[in-house]
Design a protein with these regions (language model features):
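N-terminal active-site segment of His-dependent metallophosphoesterases
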Residues: 1-62, 147-149, 175-183
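Metal-dependent catalytic neighborhoods of phosphoester/phosphodiester hydrolases
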Residues: 52-69, 78, 83-92, 120-122, ...
Length: 183
């Protein structure tokens, strides 16, 4: 089982092509390409954390069918464009506004929005987010996992680390000694 992250798919969103300069001839072409890339990247046994803004402009039945057709066990970290009926779709394994995961020797905090500081930041944990569509300069150990930054497909922690050159932090913070006894 592999662990993947994505955000800001905006399936069905007519304005996404122009707002985010997506290179597709139509919304239908955009949706088809993202579905195909998701399903060639993710297997049925994999796990995917979607960090918000799943779909806009699709009815609830279409959203449910779309979610069901995407490979993997899917979790939603809600975004500003996820209405209550998206949060209630049966295809989500879990739904929450914030999550923390540990995998491949790394910890990560997950939210639709980027943080300036986050839990365990000093211990090397990552902040994975969406919302900014690749337009926000990241802090160290921070990454926008939105499809606009990752060829319209989910990504792994290894791919994120390779692009960002993030090194695993030591498991223990060094002890700092100063004259006068602090530390």
């Amino acid at each position: 089982m592999a662990l993947f992250f994505t955000s800001d798919t905006h399936f069905g969103h007519a304005g996404a092509r122009s707002l985010y300069r997506r290179p597709f001839a139509s919304v239908a072409a955009m949706d088809a390409a993202m579905r195909a890339r998701w399903n060639t990247t993710v297997s049925a046994a994999d796990e995917v954390w979607h960090l918000g803004d799943f779909a806009l402009g699709l009815g609830v039945v279409a959203r449910a069918a779309l979610l069901e057709g995407l490979h993997g066990r899917k979790h939603l970290v809600s975004g500003n464009n996820d209405p209550p009926d998206t949060l209630a779709l049966a295809g989500w394994s879990s739904v929450q506004p914030y999550a923390e995961v540990e995998a491949d020797g790394r910890g990560a905090v997950l939210c639709h929005y980027a943080f300036r500081t986050w839990r365990n930041m000093g211990r090397g944990w990552l902040n994975l987010h969406g919302h900014s569509h690749g337009r926000l300069k990241p802090l160290p150990r921070q990454a926008d996992v939105g499809v606009d930054s990752w060829d319209f497909r989910p990504v792994t922690l290894q791919q994120i680390a390779a692009r960002r050159r993030i090194r695993a932090a030591p498991s223990r913070l060094p002890r700092i000694s100063t004259p006068g006894g602090i530390g």
